């Protein structure tokens, strides 16, 4: 089977690395970004399109990686009339349960096949081609998108019909956010009890309570390394998606409610564009 032609819409924190890995795998690639200057650095590996319509015209796979469901929907509306009946829309933005249902309906209206496939991982895994893809959608389109998924990820988990991927992504993000906030609180408690907060990381290192993520985010908190791998503003957006999904399922997530409040406090203090580990600054 020949390599698919790919249109990647959204070349921000995640999209740039994904684009480079798709191109490195030999797939013809066109890229577009709402802020055009964010796409221009990819001119060495892809065709930088001046419009969504130009990017998607003739593409076999259209990949969306933008901020939220409204951004995704607005972007794909600009593709209307340029999408072929065999086009597969590989939707990888985090949009939540209702968002995925909304986009599935839009895909039907646009006349394209829809695969809901958010990812686990942030900027570095995206650059390294090491994302975990949570894919959901019709089985018959899988061979057509496998080259793309193999290029951007180290593993693809197929989890059912379209929408299942977004539901699993929320559960995974709930765990990530809880861990980040837990690290921040443990460091703050160590500090305010009169100890060097680095002692917390030393105490758990290498034991059953440790994990690479604990050391990574904990060290970032102590060193002030807040360059955004996952910006607080995006984490707050996703926390709202998690709580909305839980409410729809009749589930009370008390811990996540508290995490969301701390993220909001950090965003209100001006840290929204910093990494979510900057929640530590407001403890």
What are these regions (language model features)?
Residues 1-64, 123:
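NAD(P)+-binding Rossmann beta1-loop-alpha1 motif at the extreme N-terminus of oxidoreductases
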Residues 53-112:
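Rossmann-fold NAD(P) dinucleotide-binding segment
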Residues 166, 175, 210-277, 282-283:
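Interdomain hinge/lid region at the active-site interface
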Residues 129-136, 157, 161-193, 202-216, ...:
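Active-site-proximal catalytic alpha-helix in oxidoreductases
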Residues 29, 48, 113-115, 156, ...:
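Hydrophobic beta-strand scaffold residues
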Residues 75, 94-173:
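Rossmann-fold dinucleotide-binding core
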